[in-house]
Amino acid sequence: MNITIICVGKLKEKYLKLAIDEYSKRLSRYCKLNIVELNDEKTPDNASEKDELIIKQKEGSKILAHVKENMYVIALDLNGKMASSEELAELIGDLGLKGKSNIALVIGGSLGLSKEVLNRANYKLSFSKMTFPHQLMRVILLEQIYRAYKINAGEPYHK
């Protein structure tokens, strides 16, 4: 299975890069992982709603440029469906059984995802009602994908 993580914003913190590297290495025995980092648009402190909408649309266009037609798109969205680790494992497993071998998981920038990206998404996933920094969300997402593969393989993993 090919999994592409499309994320807005570059990782600057070394500890987050180390965590990403570790989970990428662990996932390499289960899937082909590709992480696409896109430059975020600068948001002025006094940005109006219109300014924020334009920024989300620009970031959304960059995201959609990396989404191939055959990809099953899972957008991380505060208003998406919450799922347990087991439910995420089931979703990933079912996609593989249905021949959906290209999955894109999308993490927006600090303003979230554009309407266009959300409309393209096949599934909207929420990890919590809380808001997380999008850089940290990348680590959390990779850990949950790794956990899903361990669950599907029937392998033990620390709970």
Curated annotation (Swiss-Prot):
Transmembrane segments: none
Chief place of localization: cytoplasm
Location in or out of the cell: Cytoplasm
The entry's keywords: Cytoplasm, Methyltransferase, rRNA processing, S-adenosyl-L-methionine, Transferase
Reaction catalysis annotation: pseudouridine(1915) in 23S rRNA + S-adenosyl-L-methionine = N(3)-methylpseudouridine(1915) in 23S rRNA + S-adenosyl-L-homocysteine + H(+)
InterPro entries linked: Alpha/beta_knot_MTases (IPR029028), RlmH-like (IPR003742), tRNA_m1G_MTases_N (IPR029026)
E.C. code: 2.1.1.177
Binding site for S-adenosyl-L-methionine: L76, G108, F127, S128, K129, M130, T131, F132
Class of enzymatic activity (EC top level): transferase
Stated role: Specifically methylates the pseudouridine at position 1915 (m3Psi1915) in 23S rRNA.
Oligomeric and partner information: Homodimer.
Name assigned to this protein: Ribosomal RNA large subunit methyltransferase H
Organism: Clostridium novyi (strain NT)
Primary gene name: rlmH
